[in-house]
A protein has these predicted regions:
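Sec-dependent signal peptide recognition
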Residues: 1-4
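Mature extracytoplasmic domains of secretory-pathway proteins
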Residues: 44-93
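Short, intrinsically disordered, charge-biased short linear motifs at domain edges
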Residues: 18-20, 70-77, 109-114
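N-proximal, solvent-exposed amphipathic alpha-helical segments enriched in charged/polar residues
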Residues: 11-48, 56-58
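Polar/charged, Gly/Pro-rich intrinsically disordered segments
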Residues: 35-38, 45, 50-60, 92-128
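Extracellular/lumenal and peripheral-membrane lipid-interaction modules
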Residues: 29, 33, 73-79, 97, ...
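N-terminal signal peptide c-region/cleavage motif recognized by signal peptidases
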Residues: 6-9
Length: 128
């Protein structure tokens, strides 16, 4: 019984897991994900991790010049790759399974929000 109780006492709550993750990885930022995508910040807000990315382009106005259909395709490609990467990470999967959610925010180089979405446990389960 004592061993069981100790293992429960050490179990992380979603808030604690998010805080520990953000504290650890914040020290490694900024992180260049691809030549056009940089992770600039990770914040924990309760049981939510907020990831702030900057999208860089050769021409700063390139995003604004995309037709709506092209912009939606661009966003969908980033979301698909980002979800695939998150759902392969064991630490992320463990956090999602205990109730942590990931808010993914994507900004232009001048700080304008381009799009955002949330990753939850069920999103990764759909990929399996």
């Amino acid at each position: 019984f004592a061993l069981f109780f100790c293992s429960l006492a050490l179990a992380l709550t979603p808030d604690m897991a998010a805080k520990n993750h953000a504290t650890y990885y914040k020290k490694k930022l900024p992180f260049i994900c691809t030549p056009t995508l940089t992770l600039n910040d990770i914040l924990n807000v309760g049981d939510t991790l907020v990831y702030r990315y900057a999208i860089k382009h050769a021409r700063k106005q390139e995003i604004r010049r995309l037709e709506e259909k092209e912009l939606l395709e661009f966003i969908e490609a980033i979301k698909k790759e980002n979800l695939r990467t998150a759902c392969k990470d064991k630490e992320i999967l463990n956090m999602l399974s205990i109730g942590v959610t990931l808010d993914e925010l994507f900004y232009s180089e001048n700080g304008e929000l381009i799009f955002e979405y949330t990753i939850e446990d069920r999103d990764c389960k759909k990929l399996q």
